[in-house]
């Protein structure tokens, strides 16, 4: 995805957070990008050679405490609508044998998480053959570690719109599409932000779809008096106007692979 497209997406959705995985870029490049997309803050994990790298951009609307920061996940504590919450941003290991270690870490984190917890990103894994199209059918046992992590952490998927097959790749027998990207929350999150949802957007110069998640504690209902005009994009006060009407905060998750 080009920098220009990132800027356009941020102007369109005014997200409170933006997570980039597989950035392959150093901090100086990402700091320049931060200025272009208009975020107040940036936390990065440096890539190793020509692979890896994470970046979390966020606005001053959120007081963020970083709890864990490494090449696979960023774990934070923040306040949303007066509620203390936890948020984890994931980039699952593309190497299958290495994924179990990530699931174990998440389960250790989940044991002590009774407060609202939101987790989102590219997990590089699916829960079953129903989340893939094309390629060879996988054995049911291969999905068990990921499912066990989800169950152990008490995570529940959010409703979504759009095409759930968020990644497309090529294999010897043709194209493969999988739902590698998702957002989930524990029971407490669903209790507080009961109308949280996500949307799979278009693929823009990437093999992953953009994933947009809206955090809502009530239905997003726009009155007939509120008419959105694209000419407002980028204008001062747009984000505040939308939040006042819908009461929501948006996270945009973009994979740079």
Predicted segments, located by residue:
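A shared catalytic/ligand-binding motif for oxyanion handling
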Residues: 1-257
């Amino acid at each position: 995805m080009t920098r220009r497209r990132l800027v356009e997406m941020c102007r369109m959705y005014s997200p409170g957070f933006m997570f980039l995985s597989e950035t392959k870029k150093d901090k100086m490049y990402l700091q320049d990008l931060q200025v272009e997309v208009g975020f107040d803050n940036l936390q990065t994990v440096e890539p190793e050679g020509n692979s890896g790298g994470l970046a979390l951009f966020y606005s001053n609307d959120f007081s963020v405490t970083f709890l864990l920061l490494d090449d696979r996940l960023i774990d934070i504590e923040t306040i949303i609508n007066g509620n203390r919450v936890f948020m984890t941003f994931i980039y699952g290991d593309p190497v299958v044998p290495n994924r179990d270690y990530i699931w174990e870490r998440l389960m250790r984190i989940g044991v002590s998480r009774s407060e609202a917890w939101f987790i989102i990103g590219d997990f590089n894994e699916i829960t079953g053959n129903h989340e893939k199209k094309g390629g060879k059918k996988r054995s049911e046992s291969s999905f068990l570690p990921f499912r066990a992590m989800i169950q152990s952490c008490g995570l529940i998927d959010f409703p979504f719109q759009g095409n759930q097959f968020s990644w497309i790749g090529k294999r010897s027998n043709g194209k493969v599409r999988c739902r590698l990207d998702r957002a989930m929350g524990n029971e407490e999150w669903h209790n507080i932000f009961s109308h949280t949802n996500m949307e799979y957007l278009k693929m823009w110069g990437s093999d992953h779809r953009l994933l947009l998640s809206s955090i809502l504690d009530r239905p997003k209902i726009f009155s007939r008096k509120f008419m959105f005009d694209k000419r407002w994009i980028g204008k001062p006060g747009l984000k505040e106007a939308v939040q006042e009407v819908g009461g929501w905060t948006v996270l945009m998750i973009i994979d740079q692979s």
